[in-house]
Design a protein with these regions (language model features):
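Long, positively charged amphipathic alpha-helical accessory segments at protein N-termini or as interdomain linkers
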Residues: 12-16, 22-40, 50-178
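Catalytic domains of carbohydrate-active enzymes, especially glycoside hydrolases
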Residues: 44
C-alpha cells in the first residue's frame, strides 16, 4: 500500500474535539520521528507537513456522544498527481526508501494514546513547538473562502487560531492557511 489511512472513535464526554485534533497532530509527528527520525511540522488546524509540503491530515467529526477521528498520511506514494505535486509529498519521497506502514501506525497510535492523558496546556505547548508558522505572515482563508492576510500569533486554550489582522488580534475557529 502507498498511504496510511485510519479512523478511531473517542467518547466525547471525556475529550474536547479541538484539543483532540492538536493531540493527534503531535502524536503523528512524534510517531513519525520515533520511527523514521524525520522532523515534521504542524500547520493549523490539522495538517502534517515537511518542508512546507503536506504529508497528511486529520479530520475530526463530532457526533452526539462520540468523536470520530480520521487520519490520512502519504507514506509510499511516489507518483502524486500533478495538481498536488508542488504542495504535497510522501515519506518515501523524503527518505528515499519504502516505509513499513504497520509499525509506523503502532508508533503513531501509541503516541496519541499517551497524549490523551496529558493536560490541555501541555498539549498546546507541544503543538506550538511543532507549528511551522508561529509569528509568520500567512494567507488565511475563512470558511466562506474569503482571503485574509494576517500574522499567525498563536493558538488559544481551545485550539483556535489567534491572528494579527491589521494590528488587531482576532480569534478564528475555522478556515485554513495556504
Amino acid at each position: 500500500g502507498e498511504s496510511l489511512t485510519f479512523s478511531f472513535i473517542i467518547d466525547s464526554r471525556n475529550q474536547d474535539s479541538e484539543i483532540l485534533s492538536l493531540c493527534c497532530g503531535v502524536g503523528i509527528v512524534n510517531g513519525i520521528k520515533e520511527f523514521t527520525h524525520l522532523n515534521c511540522n504542524l500547520k493549523w488546524p490539522n495538517d502534517i507537513m515537511f518542508d512546507n509540503h503536506k504529508i497528511g491530515g486529520i479530520l475530526i467529526e463530532k457526533k452526539k456522544d462520540c468523536i470520530i477521528v480520521g487520519i490520512g498520511l502519504n507514506i509510499n506514494d511516489s507518483n502524486l498527481n500533478s495538481e498536488i505535486k508542488n504542495k504535497a509529498t510522501s515519506l518515501k519521497k523524503i527518505l528515499n526508501y519504502s516505509i513499513q506502514r504497520e509499525p509506523l501506525l503502532a508508533y503513531i497510535v501509541n503516541n496519541i494514546e499517551q497524549l490523551l492523558n496529558y493536560k490541555n496546556d501541555k498539549i498546546i505547548k507541544m503543538w506550538l513547538s511543532l507549528c511551522n508558522h508561529i509569528n509568520q505572515d500567512i494567507n488565511f482563508y475563512t470558511t466562506k473562502n474569503k482571503l485574509v492576510k494576517a500574522k499567525f500569533v498563536t493558538i488559544n486554550s481551545n485550539g483556535e487560531a489567534i491572528l494579527n489582522i491589521n494590528g488587531k488580534k482576532e480569534v478564528l475557529q475555522s478556515g485554513f492557511i495556504q
